[in-house]
Amino acid sequence: MTGIGNQTSGIETGVHDRAPADGEPTALPISHSPLPIPGAHARPPRFALIAGEASGDILGAGLIAQLRLRYPNAEFVGIGGDAMRGAGCQTWFDASELAVMGLTEVLRHLPRLLKLRSAFRERVLAWKPDVFIGIDAPDFNLPVERWLKQRGIKTVHYVSPSVWAWREKRAEKIAVSADLVLCLFPMEPPIYAKHGVDARFVGHPMADDIAYQADRDAARATLGLSASSTVLAVLPGSRHGEISRLGDTFLQAAWLVCEHIPNLHVLVPAANAGCKQLLAEQLSRSSLPVMRSHLINGQARTAMLAADVVLLASGTATLEAMLVKRPMVVGYKVAPLTYRIVKLLGLIKVNRYALPNILANDDLAPELMQDDCMPERLCVALLDWLKHPAKVAALQPRYLALHAALRRDASARAAEAVAGLLQGRDWSGANI
C-alpha cells in the first residue's frame, strides 16, 4: 500500500506527544479547521472519508475532485492514501493501516483495527462532518457508518460489497448504516431494492479513465520493449499476503511459458516498496532468465497495456485488464482456513470469480482457483491465448461492450448523488 507520505501539521491534540504503543494506530495530524461555532456564519461543507486500500484511495480522490467543483471551499478529512492527500484530503490515518484481507488475516489484526476504528469515529464526531463517505472496506466502514448515522450524520457507502456473490443479507445491514449506496456495477441496485436500500449505479471511474482503444506500442516504448516482442504481465496482487501465496506459483508458470516461447518478456509490476522487495526475492529463486524478467515500480496498467496476455490475481485488476482489452488468466488462493470456512458455510453464491466473467455472465477468462492454481495449469491457459490470435480477436468486442456499459462519468455522478444527499433532495442521475 502507499506510505504515510507528506504529513500535514495541525492542532496539537497530544497524539504525537509520545510514540504509539505496539498495536496502536498511527495517527496523522488533525485538520487546522476549527469546530463550528453555534450561531456563527455558515461554514463550508465538511466531508469525512475512509478508503482502505489503493483502489479506494483513487476513488476517493476522484470524488473529492468532483465535490470541490460543486463546493470549492469544502473541507475533507479521513483515512486515505497519496491520491486522496493529493486531492486535498487531510488524512488522520493512512489507508495502509486497513490493508488486511481474509478471515485469518483480519483476526490477527483485529485488536489494532478496533482501536483505530474507535479512535477515528470519536475524532470525526468531534469534527462534525456534514456527510461521511465510507469507500469499500465494508467490514471496517459499515460499523463506522452505522455509529455516525445513529448520531445524526448523513452517511454514504461508496462501492457496494459483493452482495451478488455472497452474503446477500448484508444489504439489510447496510440499510441501517448508509443513507445512500453508490454502486459501480449495474447488477447491484436491483439487489438493494429488494431490501429497501437507496442504491445508485454511478458507473466505474476506471472505465472513464481508460480509452476504448489501448495503445500497446506506446506502452512498450515506455517500458523499453520492442513492438515485436511477446510479453506476459504477471500481477500476483498488491498485498503482501497475496504475493506470498501467489507469487512463486505465478513466476513458475511464467518460466514454463518461457520454455515454449524462448523470446518471452515477463513484466512484474510492484505496487510499492514492500511488494517489490518480496517479488525480488521470489524472482531470485525462480527459474526465469534474468534478461527476460523485468521487475518494475508500479505501472501495472502500463504493464498490462504492453502485454500480449496477463496472469493476475482475482480482484479489481481483472477489471483493469478487461478495460485495456487484454486476454487474461486468473488465479487465486486464499488462506486454507479461510477457504475451508467459506466452503463449509456455503457463503459463495457465484460460480465465477473474475469481474469480466461476472459482468458478461460468461467465461471470458480462465479461472484457476485454490488447488487448481498451479504452475502447469496456468501455463496451459496462458499458451492457449498466445497460440490462438483469432480467439483473442473474438474477445475484443465483448470487452468493448462491457467497457461502454461501465463508462458513465462515475466520479461526477457519485458527487452529484452526495450533493443531493447533503442538500436533502432526490437524485436520479437522469441528467448526468
Swiss-Prot record:
Residues 1-35 are annotated as: Disordered. Keywords: Glycosyltransferase, Lipid A biosynthesis, Lipid biosynthesis, Lipid metabolism, Transferase. Pathway: Bacterial outer membrane biogenesis; LPS lipid A biosynthesis. It catalyses: a lipid X + a UDP-2-N,3-O-bis[(3R)-3-hydroxyacyl]-alpha-D-glucosamine = a lipid A disaccharide + UDP + H(+). It is an enzyme of class 2 (transferase). Pfam families: LpxB. GO terms for biological process: lipid A biosynthetic process. SUPFAM superfamilies: UDP-Glycosyltransferase/glycogen phosphorylase. Its EC number is 2.4.1.182. CDD domains: Glycosyltransferase_GTB-type. It comes from the Bacteria. Residues 1-11 have a biased composition (Polar residues). GO terms for cellular component: membrane. GO terms for molecular function: lipid-A-disaccharide synthase activity; phospholipid binding. The keyword Transmembrane helix does not apply. PANTHER family: LIPID-A-DISACCHARIDE SYNTHASE, LIPID-A-DISACCHARIDE SYNTHASE, MITOCHONDRIAL-RELATED. Condensation of UDP-2,3-diacylglucosamine and 2,3-diacylglucosamine-1-phosphate to form lipid A disaccharide, a precursor of lipid A, a phosphorylated glycolipid that anchors the lipopolysaccharide to the outer membrane of the cell. Belongs to the LpxB family. This is Lipid-A-disaccharide synthase. It comes from Xanthomonas oryzae pv. oryzae (strain KACC10331 / KXO85).
